[in-house]
């Protein structure tokens, strides 16, 4: 019985220490939350450019596909 109490007390002690370390880390992260690093700014700019390029690419493909389809339908209907 004594060893069981000792083990439980030891586990409680370890849990308390790990919890306090996590809280310290969390508070340190919250302190830095207001500032953006250069890497975060670059990542944000690159993501924006990537999304823009995807949108332009889709528009180009869509326009090209419509052009090809209209040409093919014109040739099939022999109205060109």
From Swiss-Prot:
One of its GO terms (cellular component) is extracellular region. This is Gaegurin-4. Residues 23-43 form a propeptide. Expressed by the skin glands. Transmembrane segments: none annotated. It is found in: Secreted. InterPro entries: Antimicrobial_frog_2 (IPR012521), EF_Hand_1_Ca_BS (IPR018247), Frog_antimicrobial_propeptide (IPR004275). Monomer. The keyword Transmembrane does not apply. Its main location: secreted. Keywords: Amphibian defense peptide, Antibiotic, Antimicrobial, Cleavage on pair of basic residues, Disulfide bond, Secreted, Signal. Disulfide bonds join 74-80. Belongs to the frog skin active peptide (FSAP) family. Brevinin subfamily. GO terms for biological process: defense response to bacterium. Has a non-hemolytic activity. Has a broad spectrum of activity against both Gram-positive and Gram-negative bacteria, fungi and protozoa. Residues 1-22 form the signal peptide.
């Amino acid at each position: 019985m004594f060893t069981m109490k000792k083990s439980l007390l030891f586990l409680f002690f370890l849990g308390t220490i790990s919890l306090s370390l996590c809280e310290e880390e969390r508070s340190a992260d919250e302190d830095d939350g207001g500032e953006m690093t250069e890497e975060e700014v670059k990542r944000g700019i690159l993501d924006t450019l990537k999304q823009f390029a995807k949108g332009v690419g889709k528009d180009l493909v869509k326009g090209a596909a419509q052009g090809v389809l209209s040409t093919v339908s014109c040739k099939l209907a022999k109205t060109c």
